Design a protein with these regions (language model features):
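SAM-dependent transferase fold signal centered on methyltransferase-like domains
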Residues: 1-237
Length: 237
């Protein structure tokens, strides 16, 4: 006997609901059903909290073309690997799944901005949601910039199907005047702003920088050792 359930998300007009108390049927009911049925699966929102995964179950974050579409929780014989997993789906490619064991033994996050390597990697969002960025750090021989930000620094280039790679051009502590000066000196007027792990809003940053040149650039706003930094990069993969 097996079963599946897709709890409805509570309606909110302002922001996404992440509380399991707001879904229907309730998370308690879903777990109760799973305790009675040998094989159960539940499809939940990508914001499913890691700590809510039942003992022995598999919480699988799934992405399609880089966007996380769901977190599926599996019980009993439907479990392929207990714990947190990430499955990446892309057109024309086989599904790729990472597990917690793939991330074990990763180096700790960078201790300073000076330790930043020549390449910045950004894993698929399912990998980040599942908390498995360490798998990328291990693969490329690098380290996450700060705990939980999702960016990985490494010294060497490596093509990873489930990650984007950027060449680091410059990096500095976040300071509007300093970043504006660096960009203006290179005639940058069109700026792609990426961010992870910081509260800065890209459009507000764009207004503060007041750029007017004809060149293009990309900046990643993130954290290193708890400090907000700006990393200027060129897309490489």
């Amino acid at each position: 006997m097996s079963g599946s359930t897709r709890p409805a998300r509570a309606r909110r007009t302002a922001r996404r609901v992440v509380s399991l108390d707001r879904i229907s049927p309730t998370w308690r009911d879903v777990q109760g059903y799973a305790a009675q049925v040998p094989a159960t699966g539940a499809k939940l929102a990508p914001a499913f909290p890691h700590a809510a995964r039942p003992e022995g179950a598999e919480a699988q974050w799934v992405s399609w073309r880089g966007d996380v579409v769901e977190c599926a929780v599996w019980w009993g014989p439907l479990v392929e690997t207990a714990g947190r997993t990430a499955t990446v789906l892309r057109p024309g490619s086989d599904a790729m799944t990472l597990t917690e064991s793939d991330a074990e033994g990763a180096d700790p996050p960078l201790e300073s901005l000076g330790a930043l390597g020549g390449y910045l990697y950004e894993p698929d969002r399912a990998v980040i949601r599942a908390g498995l960025t360490g798998a990328l750090a291990r693969l490329v021989g690098g380290a996450e910039l700060d705990d939980g930000v999702g960016y990985v620094s490494a010294a060497a280039p490596l093509d990873v199907p489930w990650a984007h790679r950027y060449t680091v051009v410059e990096a500095m502590p976040w300071n509007v005047k300093a970043v504006r000066g660096w960009l203006r000196s290179r005639g940058v007027g069109r700026l792609t702003i990426k961010k992870r792990g910081v509260s800065l809003e890209p459009e507000a940053v764009r207004r503060q920088l007041r750029l007017s040149g004809s060149s293009e650039a990309t900046v990643a706003l993130t954290r290193v050792a708890g400090q907000t930094v700006a990393v200027m990069v060129d897309p490489a993969w």
